[in-house]
Amino acid sequence: MTNREHDSRTAVRRLVAAAAAALAVAAALAVTLVLAAAAVAQPARSHAQITVLAAASLTDVLPQIDQAPRYSFAGSDTLASQIRLGAPADVFAAANTTLPDQLYSAGLVEKPVVFTANKLVLVTPKSNPADIKSVFDLRRSGIKLLVGTATVPIGSYTRKILKNLSLSGILSNVVSQENDVRSILGKVGLGEADAGFVYLTDAKTVSDKVTVIALPAWAQPPVRYGVAVIKASTNRSDAVSFINKLLARDGQTKLKAAGFTAPKGIATAYSGG
């Protein structure tokens, strides 16, 4: 072997050794990065943002109580249907107790509790062009009335109070049935109808756009809101914690400030089950 060949082979060996060392360093760095990423990701999973499916009438108040969750607001009946179809979520807060109870019986949510209450009012456009002064004026021919569909809480409550008032006949003046209370409120505020039945709490949020007409207290049906952890929740601990925030003094204070009330016998803590 000539000196030139020997030097050439030596140079090749050095290059191979250097390349191997570089690959080893790169592999070690990759493992380090993977482990570091796993260490960062682990707490993120245990404190993942929960998803709360909540009645439209809770749109303004829930973020005041807890800003952390991802909220989806809609008609309670629509949200219950989503849960039945397997929508990924952690908490269900409805504008009645019927839907949470039905889902509990179906094994889709944990045992629900009542966390707040509301009452019904009649609203007209701010200018009140139909000159409606009481719920009994809705008997007049030609009145354009908005109500919720019979399957959503606001629609069910509306039909109950009308039955209590012996006014079920005014449903003949209904020009549209809506899927949630915010739709009723929005259309009345825009003057698309002469009147509509909504919750007091929703009416308070747009007092500059609607006129509120009180309904007889004796005819009011119990309007109670139920909440429960969804069985398919991937973060039950935070879901339970959220519900306990609703039941805690601060949560109840904020609900009261928004116009909600605390019914007798309300739970003070939630454990599910």
Residue ranges and their predicted role:
Residues 1-13:
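N-terminal secretory signal peptides that target proteins for export/translocation
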Residues 7, 24, 43-44:
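Generic low-complexity segments that are intrinsically disordered, proline-rich and/or Lys/Arg-biased
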Residues 13-17, 51:
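Alpha-helical transmembrane segments of integral membrane proteins
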Residues 19-36:
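Bacterial N-terminal signal peptides
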Residues 35-66, 70-72, 77, 81-85, ...:
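Exported/periplasmic ABC-transporter solute-binding proteins
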Residues 6, 15, 110, 214-215:
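Generic detector of short alpha-helix boundary/capping microenvironments
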